[in-house]
């Protein structure tokens, strides 16, 4: 598939500035062909985010965008990353990102290692402290 890809975006479902369909439409106008919505997630909002984004796949296709449903696990205690990532995939996430250890977002020590050793995690974002 040609065009631009963005596999790490946020919407007003967490700390982004656009509602999900607006993000999809703007990405379409800018020439993106694949976009993943990967709002910050933990056990309290994981199912809600996945269900919400998956509802947009058909409207996104009408704008010429292949929408991937994702989550960015943030502040999950490292021992719980594997089961949380597995739950995300089981419940319909196409991509699982983990927010890494960085000076900007002080997630728990050991998060980077837990993410890198988990087969259900696709991307370690903002690894900062390696």
Identify the meaning behind each predicted range:
Residues 4-14, 40, 127:
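Histidine-centered catalytic micro-motifs
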Residues 2, 31-34, 57-58:
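Active-site gating loops and adjacent loop-to-helix segments of metal-dependent hydrolytic enzymes
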Residues 12-50:
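Metal-associated gating/positioning segment near the N- to mid-region
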Residues 3-5, 36, 123:
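Residue-level marker for buried hydrophobic side chains located in beta-strands
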Residues 46-130:
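Extended substrate/RNA-proximal surfaces in nucleic-acid metabolism proteins
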């Amino acid at each position: 598939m040609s065009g631009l890809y963005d596999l790490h975006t946020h919407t007003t479902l967490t700390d982004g500035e656009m509602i999900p369909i607006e993000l999809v439409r703007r990405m379409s106008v800018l020439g993106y062909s694949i976009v993943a919505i990967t709002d910050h997630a933990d056990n309290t909002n994981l199912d809600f985010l996945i269900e919400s984004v998956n509802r947009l796949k058909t409207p996104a296709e009408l704008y010429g965008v292949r929408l991937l449903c994702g989550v960015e696990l943030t502040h999950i205690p490292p021992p719980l990353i594997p089961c949380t990532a597995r739950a995300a995939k089981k419940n319909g996430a196409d991509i699982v990102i983990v927010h890494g250890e960085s000076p900007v977002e002080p997630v728990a020590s050991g998060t980077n290692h837990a993410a890198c050793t988990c087969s259900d995690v696709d991307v370690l974002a903002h690894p900062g402290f390696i």
